[in-house]
Swiss-Prot record:
Taxonomic lineage of the native organism: Viruses, Duplodnaviria, Heunggongvirae, Peploviricota, Herviviricetes
Use of this protein: Used in molecular biology as a selectable marker to identify transfected eukaryotic cells. Used in cancer suicide gene therapy to selectively kill transformed cells.
Name of the protein in question: Thymidine kinase
Gene name of the record: TK
Binding site for substrate: Y101, Q125, R222
Function, as annotated: Catalyzes the transfer of the gamma-phospho group of ATP to thymidine to generate dTMP in the salvage pathway of pyrimidine synthesis. The dTMP serves as a substrate for DNA polymerase during viral DNA replication. Allows the virus to be reactivated and to grow in non-proliferative cells lacking a high concentration of phosphorylated nucleic acid precursors.
Keywords: ATP-binding, DNA synthesis, Early protein, Kinase, Nucleotide-binding, Transferase
Record GO terms (molecular function): ATP binding; thymidine kinase activity
Pfam family, one: Herpes_TK
Organism of this sequence: Human herpesvirus 1 (strain HFEM)
Domain of life assignment: Viruses
Composition bias, Basic residues: 19-32
């Protein structure tokens, strides 16, 4: 049998989990799918890959937690894909993050119009999203079906991503819409560009009390950032709605069937922290769909124009297959790391598609980090 890079070290990450007493307890929004086949397909003979996307509002402690987790494994069996800070600051445009915060500040101060702000924000968000979208496209041919057995061996490779493409193509545009600096039409344009959800997409969202979140955000130093409490509230709201939306869709919810339950065009109030799969299916009014009952998107008869309805169909199709986990960040960095490690034991692996996929994926991830990571 051929040897793949990472096989000789594949148990290092798993051993770290066992040494901390972590079980295979599932805390995702959707139960693990059992796909026990009577015949072994050729794909099932390939090594497996675990992809983990650490996402959620900025300033919770995602990067610190991820770096501590990565340090537990060997260089060969776990690879970190950081935020593409160099692309945002240099390669794609000049100081994109600073431009976004400055534009919002100028809008809030009445120095520019909402229309002018929307032009800048939309352009900047394209720059933010490009590295995520293109990396997902390059990775996609190597992702096979989900390894559904609950007794799957440790993966040959674990990829830890600092955010999924939906952060740049859905969540932050939606938050900017709530802030008045992006149009709902632009948000749905980004939604239409969200890549198809690959099998084994494990997304970790975060929970942290707002006062603790503000304190952490105030203490961190990121190039170009401002402490914008209104934006923090908006992005927390959006990620809460995202978690609800996945639960709603996986619970059988249909936005088209339930659209009539939405009334008016009011933005939903601030919700609670994202929840796991406990409790009943959320109401459509507590999901992202409620954001798009906006006058700009409605025909004279009150229905959505078809082009915008199709975009919401895309949104539902992209979010429904995701495996969403909730990490409690209201603990020490080491505690967050250990909690994240425990979550990984219940995540969904995928088979790769070719014998050369594992080294190719490693090279892709390291090239991304080397060329676009913050160290540059």
């Amino acid at each position: 049998m051929a040897s793949y890079p990472g096989h000789q070290h594949a148990s290092a990450f798993d051993q770290a989990a066992r040494s901390r007493g972590h079980s295979n307890r599932r805390t995702a929004l959707r139960p693990r799918r059992q796909q026990e086949a009577t015949e072994v397909r050729p794909e099932q003979k390939m090594p497996t890959l675990l992809r983990v996307y650490i996402d959620g509002p900025h300033g919770m402690g995602k990067t610190t937690t991820t770096q501590l987790l990565v340090a537990l494994g060997s260089r060969d069996d776990i690879v970190y894909v950081p935020e593409p800070m160099t692309y945002w600051r240099v390669l794609g445009a000049s100081e994109t993050i600073a431009n976004i915060y400055t534009t919002q500040h100028r809008l809030d101060q009445g120095e520019i119009s909402a229309g002018d702000a929307a032009v800048v924000m939309t352009s900047a968000q394209i720059t933010i999203g490009m590295p995520y979208a293109v990396t997902d496209a390059v990775l996609a041919p190597h992702i096979g079906g989900e390894a559904g057995s609950s007794h799957a061996p440790p993966p040959a490779l674990t990829l830890i991503f600092d955010r999924h493409p939906i952060a740049a193509l859905l969540c932050y545009p939606a938050a900017r819409y709530l802030m008045g600096s992006m149009t709902p039409q632009a948000v749905l344009a980004f939604v239409a560009l969200i890549p198809p959800t690959l099998p084994g997409t494990n997304i970790v969202l975060g929970a942290l009390p707002e006062d603790r979140h503000i304190d952490r955000l105030a203490k961190r130093q990121r190039p170009g950032e401002r402490l914008d409490l209104a934006m923090l509230a908006a992005i927390r709201r959006v990620y809460g709605l995202l978690a609800n939306t996945v639960r709603y869709l996986q619970g059988g919810g249909s936005w088209r069937e339930d659209w009539g339950q939405l009334s008016g065009t009011a933005v939903p109030p601030q919700g609670a922290e994202p929840q796991s799969n406990a409790g009943p299916r959320p109401h459509i009014g507590d999901t992202l769909f409620t954001l798009f009952r906006a006058p700009e998107l409605l025909a004279p008869n009150g229905d959505l124009y078809n082009v915008f309805a199709w975009a919401l169909d895309v949104l539902a199709k992209r979010l429904r297959p995701m495996h969403v986990f909730i990490l409690d960040y209201d603990q020490s960095p080491a505690g967050c790391r250990d909690a994240l490690l425990q979550l990984t034991s219940g995540m969904i692996q995928t088979h790769v598609t070719t014998p050369g996929s594992i080294p190719t994926i490693c090279d892709l991830a390291r090239t991304f980090a080397r060329e676009m990571g913050e160290a540059n």
